[in-house]
């Protein structure tokens, strides 16, 4: 039996939105490839504001249930405002919109090259993306020009915002955190302080503690980016643990947005951690470290410092992050105006 609903769906007033599905180190990325309205605006931030103001219903329809889930992550591709960029991109999650996304860059570049959307230019194919946090220069490292082995990208300058911030967490007591920026602001703390491990079986407790820490830091510290007001908010909490693999540096979990758990090691979070480790004198010059996610040793990103600069009054590093991603499917989502539940919901 052949099922062909296209003609009837168009006649019913339904719209179709297409997407490529990918993941980087276990964290999903839903890449919207067609069916969205044109977004006016001279800059990427203007286009994102326009989408958030007029089409946030589409974020909910594509990220929330029944098409997505609480941990779903997506992105929208737009023409770049910067002439140096191949493409503009902004990212979607359960709560709204993020400023940058490391796993998203790795997954998106993999998909762009492997689908032929970006022309392959040899074993190392450069891809430049404009994001809300700035211009990101990535490289797809190919294996025999057939598929992408891994992607590396030079992230935005990253810096430590506040050291040794003491906050009180209910049921736990005082916790010492550092706040650093790597494309977004994070509160970073050792998981040992809260009596947990970064393991899948502890995820409910990790989410609760991560949210409590973020709330406590927001109550004590005003986070302000020195150059861009739209980046001035605490995005998440990173809890750091010992690694599963001896030659890896550490394991961490990031709880971000509305209690969302990153399955990957978090590319922007790793950038923030590199800035913090450098400020603490715990990194040798040009040392590369491998950081695992809550999923274990197979879910890992590699990071190193490739430069130094200033961001306003802050000493900053220029981080490079690399990791693997895979295309896992494609979708054609049907948005029917008669389907009210299909507009998006969460059970929590």
Language model feature labels by segment:
Residues 183:
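Glycine-rich ThDP/TPP pyrophosphate-binding loop and its adjacent helix/strand module
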Residues 1-178, 190-348:
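A glycine-rich beta-to-alpha transition motif near the start of alpha/beta enzyme domains, typified by
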